[in-house]
């Protein structure tokens, strides 16, 4: 990923990237995105962009493994996150879903992960401490709650499922208040141009609709241009 593409991705929202991927692929039907409504800790922040660092957690019940095993895995998890190639995004599956109760993402964990250089986090689980999270580290979560429960790390680095989206370690993630998606590797090289094409195509309708004397006849004309230009 080039610095120019990274800057482009941070400037646009996730729906724009969804559409731009289809422009790059030349067809409709891109489906590697989350389903349902997600919550964002900082909806006005730029989009979360980076390569996935994955893990699984649980919190409903106390861990059944020995405490030393849990502690060792916790340190392995933090080491794994600290060594992430940047830009990176923590993508964490709560295996208690849809009955998640343990907020893994609060003031402490967001501050730690931001300190490691990560750009944000995506989870099907719970977040909390919304007024105390550090600036510049958005979290996109399925829900908000007060407790951490018995939260503990179950697995590190394996493929995870986030609200219908399968994410593997190293996948390129784009996420914001609308949800998250995985950018296919085969469009990374053409995605920057696809974003520009999409935005210019949308302006055909938007610019006309914002002018005075916009009427149905004008709409028909610009919509025909729009249809010919879009994917």
Protein language model annotation of sequence segments:
Residues 31-33, 91-93, 121-125, 139-141, ...:
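General beta-strand structural signal in soluble alpha/beta enzymes
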Residues 128-144:
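Histidine/lysine/aspartate-rich catalytic loop segments that bind and position anionic ligands
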Residues 4-13, 193-195, 223-231:
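Long, charged alpha-helical interface segments
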Residues 1-71, 75-84, 206-214, 220:
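Intrinsically disordered, low-complexity regions enriched in acidic/Ser/Thr/Pro/Gln residues
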Residues 144-217:
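Acidic, glycine-rich flexible loop/linker segments
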Residues 21, 113, 171-173:
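Buried hydrophobic positions in well-ordered alpha/beta secondary-structure cores of metabolic enzymes
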Residues 79-126:
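Extracellular/luminal Protease-associated
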